[in-house]
Design a protein with these regions (language model features):
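Feature captures the catalytic ectodomains and active-site-proximal regions of enzymes
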Residues: 1-511
Length: 511
């Protein structure tokens, strides 16, 4: 008997907001999604703040969203966990952080704090940097340098001067710390193996290779004057003294808590074998600490070790001997695999993974179609194999193009995805399968910051849609991302495990 596949389609960054001239989702011509909303049951899901284990009012993100969806429960995020440790005082007694600081003190070497300096809360939080500076002061350190990576995506695109001024004021108040180098996240936090970008930030940190500016704030404002916003600020030197260079024996704490954009820079400092660019011997080895576990294969101590999630959706499907497929392009591949599986690198038994390369362009407004059509082509081909019971698919376009702040490109991104959705749904229904369509967080439904008049490049706290497209009749109630996995299990007629505390969104009378 042919399989009737169940598909979960995640349109990354597709939130709900009133129609308006800066809502790319509403401006786009989406005949396929419009028809599905008219015909099939749909509801709204909360995907920010406490609903996904974040502080109240904190926007969700792709990592958090996929963790919650795959776990079928609210997963308390590293942001919440670390912030709570600071509030409780446990942070300042963390053994890994204490050891790193005491080693630096004993060696008479410098401590370098590197990470994203904003309160975006997606990859890092500036309050965690302030806590590290407080801790360094308590530990009696005096040579402490900050290597500031600039955001411009999870916060406004031209706000780094404000964050750097705040950081500078905080170092003066605490009495320790100095901004040594500054780099846009485009360089320092690449995740697509564009090592030439990482090298620019690395060389600034270890060789002082870059423009020397009077101070961090004036350097950033000079970039603004040249039309370069935060994300793309070319690495520069803000404190040219010799000690601010990273040297062998120094301590380093990378305070980003989200792994995907921290891995490459971390590997540049800690990996023994490193073929991507030349590293001076003067900068190795260092005593490197990761705030969270960036990758099991990275050989560096972790300040906040991962908490294990039992009975994720992928594990339950494997336990029931079902065949599952995860498919996405490069930008969201980690999300439908690593994050969806609760931070597990290894696939479940019966879990196949397909990675479609993302296009090699500087920014995705230049190619808003990204690789959506190639993903769709491959999925259509795999659906014909009659192999899979469950498919997890992510379309990256709404999020990645939304982040550029370019409205017409975001509209094109949404129209591209709509065409792909139409093709996939038609195929799934022809196999008498079911397609659930949702998102992990909002983004492209807000493309302008009405307060500043600047393009809005961050995520939103808006709810996201959830549709069930099926030959069977269903009714739904509102919920949260954690309710998706229990819903999928009910559609598969599989009992929900106790570890999953989400609730099925189905309110069918025949339940």
């Amino acid at each position: 008997m042919a399989k009737q596949p169940l598909l979960l389609m995640i349109l990354d960054g597709w939130g709900i907001a009133p129609a308006g001239q800066y809502n790319a989702a509403a401006l786009a011509k989406t005949p396929n999604l419009d028809a599905l909303f008219d015909k099939y049951p749909h509801t709204r899901l909360s995907c920010s703040g406490a609903a996904v284990g974040l502080p109240d009012g904190q926007m969700g993100n792709s990592e958090v969203g996929h963790l919650n969806i795959g776990a079928g429960r609210i997963v308390y995020q590293e942001l919440t966990r670390i912030t709570k440790a600071i509030k409780d005082g446990d942070f300042f007694e963390n053994t890994i952080l204490s050891k790193a600081m005491q080693t630096v003190k004993a060696n008479g070497s410098a401590l370098h704090l590197l990470g994203l300096v904003s309160d975006g809360g997606v990859h890092s939080h500036i309050s965690h940097l302030f806590a590290l500076l407080e801790m360094a002061k308590l530990q009696g350190l005096n040579k402490v340098y900050v290597h500031a990576f600039l955001d411009g995506r999870d916060v406004g695109p031209q706000t780094a001067d404000v964050y750097l001024a705040e950081l500078d004021a905080e170092t003066k108040r605490i009495g320790v710390g100095k901004i040594a180098t500054v780099a846009g996240r485009y360089y320092a936090m690449d995740r697509d193996k564009r090592w030439e970008r990482v090298q620019k930030a690395y060389d600034a940190m270890v060789l002082h290779d870059g423009t020397v500016c009077t101070d961090a704030v004036s350097g950033v404002r000079a970039s603004y004057a040249g039309g370069v916003t935060d994300e793309f600020v070319v690495p520069f030197i803000a404190a040219p003294e010799a000690d601010s260079c990273v040297k062998a024996g120094d301590g380093m704490i990378f305070f980003n808590f989200r792994p995907d954009r921290a891995r490459q820079m971390t590997r540049a400092f800690v990996d023994e074998e490193f073929p991507y660019f030349a590293r001076p011997q003067t900068a190795r080895p260092v005593n490197f600490v990761c705030m969270t576990q960036y990758d099991e294969t990275i050989k560096a101590p972790v300040a906040f070790a991962p908490e294990t999630l039992e009975d994720t959706l992928g594990k339950v499907l494997a336990d029931h001997k079902l065949q599952q497929l995860r498919i996405a392009e490069t930008e969201k591949y980690a999300h439908v695999t690593f994050f969806f599986n609760g931070g597990e690198e290894e696939p479940n038994v019966g879990e196949d993974r397909v990675l479609i390369p993302s296009p090699k362009v500087a920014t995705y407004d230049l190619q808003p179609e990204m690789s959506a059509e190639l993903v769709t082509d491959k999925l259509a081909e795999l659906l014909d194999t009659d192999k899979y019971d469950m498919i997890i698919l992510n379309f990256a376009n709404p999020d990645m193009v939304g982040h550029t702040g370019v409205l017409n490109a975001a509209v094109k991104a949404m129209e591209t995805v709509d065409a792909c959705v139409g093709r996939i749904v038609e195929k799934v229904l022809s196999l008498h399968g079911t397609a659930c369509i949702t998102a992990d967080h909002g983004n492209l439904e807000k493309m302008l910051d009405e307060t500043t008049g600047q393009p809005y490049t961050a995520h939103t706290t808006n709810q996201v849609p959830f549709l069930v497209v099926s030959d069977e009749k269903h009714t739904l109630h509102e919920g949260i991302l954690a309710d998706i996995a229990p819903t999928l299990l009910e559609l598969l007629k599989i009992k929900q495990p106790a570890a999953m505390t989400g609730k099925s969104l189905l309110t069918d009378k025949n339940k």
